[in-house]
Structure formats: C-alpha cells, structure tokens
Design a protein with these regions (language model features):
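Short juxta-domain linker segments that transition from a proline/glycine-rich
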Residues: 1-403
Length: 403
C-alpha cells in the first residue's frame, strides 16, 4: 500500500510532482480519461494536474499512487523524473520480437534509474562520469572503426593490451555507465539507453552465461561510444544481413575484450611452447584467461589469421565439448553475474540506512528485496572481520548504528 502523505503541497502547484504523475500514468499504460475516471474528476482537470496548473490534493495523490502502482515517496520526489525510457526504446522495441515482454523490463529499468538518482540526492553524492566524446562512425568500415575505437578506449582507460578482468566494475566505477542485471527473456542479451540526468545505462541478462554477459556488456558499450542517443535492444537472432551497427558493436566487443597485440603475443608464446602444435585444451585455457567463450576466442584467432578459417566448425563437428574439457582441466566455471544493482547503488542505500535517513521498508524497496535480505546486504556492505586478542576471527562492525 502506498505511504500516507503528510502534506503534498503548500497550496502551490509542484512541477516535479506534476511531471512524475504524468510519467507514472504513461508507464502504467493508462489514458488521461481512464485516470480521470478512476480519480472521479473530469479529463480537463486531470490535464491541469499533470501540467502543474492545479495542485494535487493528498487524497488524490493516494488514489493515483495506487492506480499507477507507485509509492507516495516516488511520486513526491523533488527532482524531475528521469527521461522516459519507454519513449527512447520505442523504435528498438518495435523491431524486437515479443516486445510486450520487454516493456515491463523497460519500465522497471527506468524506475531503477530514478531510484539511483534519488539515492544519490539523499546521500548528497554525485554519480561519477568519465565519458569520452561520441565517435561518429558513419560511412566508415565497421570492422576498422571498431578496432580503432576499441584501441583508443583501452588507452584512455589505461588498460594496456591484456585481458579486461572486471568489465562491469570498470564501466561502473571508471566510466560511470550504470550497469544493471535484470531477468530478461532468453532471446534478449541486453539493452542500452542514454537518458539524462542518469547518463548511459546498460542492462545485461542475469540468466545468460558469464562470458555471454561480458560480450553483451562490451557490445552495448560500443553502441554507447558510437551512437549514444540511439537506444538499443540486443536480440539473439539469425540475420539474413547483419546491420552495419550490429557488425560494428560485435567487432568492437571482440577488439575490446581480445586486443590484437596482446593476443598475438600470447598466442605466439603458446605456439612456441608447443612447437607449433596448439591443442583445443590450450585454446580453452586461453579463452578462460580472457574470460570469453571458446567460440569467441577461436573466431577471434581466425579473424587475426592465427588459426585457419573454419577451425571452430571443425572442432564442433568432432564433438568437442568445452564444458567437459573445463572439468578435465580443472578450470573453474564462472557463475553468471546475477547482481541486479550496481555496487555504488547498493552502497548508497546501505549508507543511508545506517545513517537512519531511510527506513527499513524503504531500504528493502530500493534493493528490490524483502527486509531480511535487505538487512543482510547492509551487513555484508558495512561489516568486516578482524582478529581478536585471543586470536579468534571476530566481526568488525562499521555500521553499529544500523537498526
């Protein structure tokens, strides 16, 4: 049930409230007439409320909050709402199969972004950004443009030419792209949108394998660098003719995750050690070190002409099973990253709870968890361990004031 409002207005219209009411209605898929009927007012009066020309009374706000499935706290936030993701995703969703399944995800992603901004506002924090200028690749060869941009971006971020180990943390902390991992339909790898004042936002499918998630992250980051104002939904499909933008993004992912110079050096070193006889097990270990799939690694080596074309197809036809080989080689199988929220988002929520600036119920809503698990997250983020005088490991609480 929505929170009870203390006082929604001081007799003056609130522009941010009016804008949030309109955005919530649109996200709920309701017409102005339907909302007016539920409120028991005329449509022109609802229009006046949404324009901020007429103040919203407390009892009206309660009705609209219930109708739109929002809390009073969401609707009464003093900041204007985030740019509507649904509007930006309209073209991308129109081209995607089963768009209806994705609309709910888009709406929830927008609410997560708005919650992120609210947490930052309450904490007095600034969400970091270190964005490069957009690179226009119009008219350029997609593969060459992708390699050039990937090389430039790795240099900008000081990555050298080795594997990128913690890609999500890199984008979140060093670049300031907000990365979420929601549950998506199996045929959807991820999505990208740019909306102020949040900035670049990427969603990756929490149910996909770890290597696929990293590829999707790099793919969407390529879109962010080259076409920031065009939202993208990446659907796994067989194209008759792959669009240039998708060829660019996939090529960017390959070059960013497996840069030419570093991979050349590692492969030639491996080849020398094996007297030129590189095995499937060697390739699997190489893929593991770069945290990509065996298929992605072999196709990249084919692209660099370090392996003959068709090597992956031949290996597959021979019945080679990467998962079984990983077990035999003792290579750990990385679990998918199913952490819905960015680290900074969770830290802000925990900090505000510890400082008693949000309630336990609000904490749970921000973290999308029940109260027990929300408190557990706070314990994990604000607690550590130390060694006591008797040599025993004891908890070290950094948040003794937490309720």
């Amino acid at each position: 049930m929505p929170d009870q409002p203390d006082s929604t207005t001081d007799g003056q219209p609130q522009p941010s409230l009016a804008a949030r009411l309109r955005a919530a209605r649109v996200a709920a898929g309701l017409t102005q007439q339907a909302a007016a009927d539920a409120l028991g007012v005329s449509r022109p009066l609802l229009v006046a409320i949404e324009k901020g020309a007429r103040e919203t009374r407390p009892e009206e706000l309660l009705v609209l909050a219930r109708l739109y499935g929002r809390s009073i706290h969401e609707l009464a936030r003093p900041a204007p709402p985030l740019e509507a993701f649904g509007t930006q995703f309209r073209a991308a969703l129109a081209a995607a199969p089963e768009a209806g399944q994705l609309q709910g995800t888009v709406d929830e992603l927008e609410r997560l972004g708005d919650d992120y901004l609210e947490l930052a506002r309450l904490a007095g924090a600034t969400l970091p950004r270190r964005y490069p200028a957009v690179t226009d690749i119009t008219g350029l060869d997609p593969q060459q443009a992708a390699e050039d941009l990937a090389s430039n971006e790795r240099n900008r971020l000081g990555l050298g030419d080795g594997p990128v180990l913690s890609l999500r943390e890199l984008l979140d902390e060093d670049v300031g792209v907000r990365v979420f991992a929601p549950q998506l339909p199996s045929h959807v790898a991820g999505a990208f949108v740019y909306a102020e004042p949040l900035g670049g936002t990427i969603a990756v499918n929490a149910n996909h394998p770890y290597e696929r998630q990293r590829w999707t992250l790099a793919h969407e980051y390529g879109h962010f660098l080259s076409s920031r104002n065009r939202s993208e939904v990446t659907v796994l499909r067989r194209w008759e003719r792959v669009p240039a933008a998708e060829r660019f993004a996939d090529s960017f992912a390959a070059h960013f995750l497996m840069p030419r110079a570093g991979l050349h050096r590692r492969f030639h070193s491996l080849s020398r050690d094996r007297d030129g006889d590189v095995t499937a097990a060697d390739l699997l270990q190489l893929a593991h070190s770069y945290r990509v799939s065996l298929q992605a690694m072999i196709l990249r080596l084919e692209d660099l002409r370090l392996l003959p074309a068709g090597s992956f197809d031949r290996l597959r036809d021979l019945g080679f099973r990467p998962s079984e080989a990983e077990q035999l080689l003792g290579l750990p199988r990385p679990a998918p990253d199913q952490t819905l929220l960015p680290p900074r988002y969770r830290y802000l929520a925990a900090e505000l709870y510890v400082r008693a600036e949000i309630t336990e119920g609000q904490l749970a809503r921000f973290l999308r968890l029940d109260r027990v698990n929300a408190r557990r997250v706070v314990e994990e983020l604000t607690g550590s361990q130390d060694v006591g005088p008797d040599g025993d490991v004891v908890p070290l609480r950094l948040a003794e004031g937490a309720r």
